[in-house]
């Protein structure tokens, strides 16, 4: 993974998995299998690929990039092969990587999966770091990691790169990974619910009601929600 010089704020760690309907998994370092899983979900894509960032003002910047599931920011490869974090992430409207569109929202970067008129079904992939966990949480005592001093970065990309923090990993630290479906309506993201689907597909209310009677849908799981969305779109 392109992380030999990666210096990312708030990272690292892992162990035994518990999968829920929300596709959420909890882990604690240093279990090897969990560490491998952490590495596999740290970014949205398995590698850094050429992409384009579109700012709110329409400005476009190109680079070799990926989206971090921890800080929900665009990371890119600098001229020294360092992994850097885009400085003005709050000004990014969207990014295109491998032909896929990722919309920057208050929840993070959501990938557009399906479209139906002005409504899109999207997916958020999120890795959450659980610092200062209460005693007993995940079956472990409270443990944290210390942060070293800021490292300055002079790399320029999309109006500059952010200073990065380097973690001194000297203890275990729990994290969880999840995939969450969202509706994107005219640029605004909403959690997927029966009420939301009824609202944005008013002519399909009867179909939605019947579909939900015949199918036990968990609205926090991407796969069944995607099937429902496609069925509503095609009906």
What are the roles of these predicted feature ranges?
Residues 1-25, 228:
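Bacterial Sec-dependent N-terminal signal peptides
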Residues 165-227, 234:
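A short, solvent-exposed beta-edge/loop patch
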């Amino acid at each position: 993974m392109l992380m030999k010089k990666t210096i990312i704020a708030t990272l690292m760690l892992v162990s035994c998995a518990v999968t829920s309907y929300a596709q959420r998994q909890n882990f604690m370092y240093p279990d090897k299998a969990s560490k491998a899983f952490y590495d596999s979900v740290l970014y949205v894509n398995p590698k850094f690929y050429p992409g384009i960032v579109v700012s709110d003002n329409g400005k476009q910047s190109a680079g070799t990039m990926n989206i971090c599931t921890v800080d929900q920011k665009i990371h890119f490869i600098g001229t020294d092969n360092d992994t850097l974090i885009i400085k003005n992430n709050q000004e990014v409207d969207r990014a295109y990587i491998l032909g896929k569109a990722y919309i920057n929202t208050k929840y993070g970067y959501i990938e557009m999966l399906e479209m139906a008129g002005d409504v899109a079904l999207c997916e958020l992939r999120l890795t959450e770091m659980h610092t200062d966990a209460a005693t007993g949480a995940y079956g472990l005592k409270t443990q944290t990691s210390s942060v070293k001093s800021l490292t300055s970065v002079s790399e320029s990309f999309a109006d500059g790169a952010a200073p990065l923090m380097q973690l001194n990993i000297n203890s275990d630290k729990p994290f969880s990974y999840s995939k969450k479906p969202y509706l994107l309506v005219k640029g605004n993201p909403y959690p997927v619910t029966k009420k939301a689907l009824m609202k944005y597909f008013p002519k399909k209310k009867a179909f939605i009601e019947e579909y939900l009677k015949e199918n036990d849908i968990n609205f926090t799981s991407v796969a069944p929600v995607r099937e429902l969305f496609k069925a509503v779109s095609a009906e």
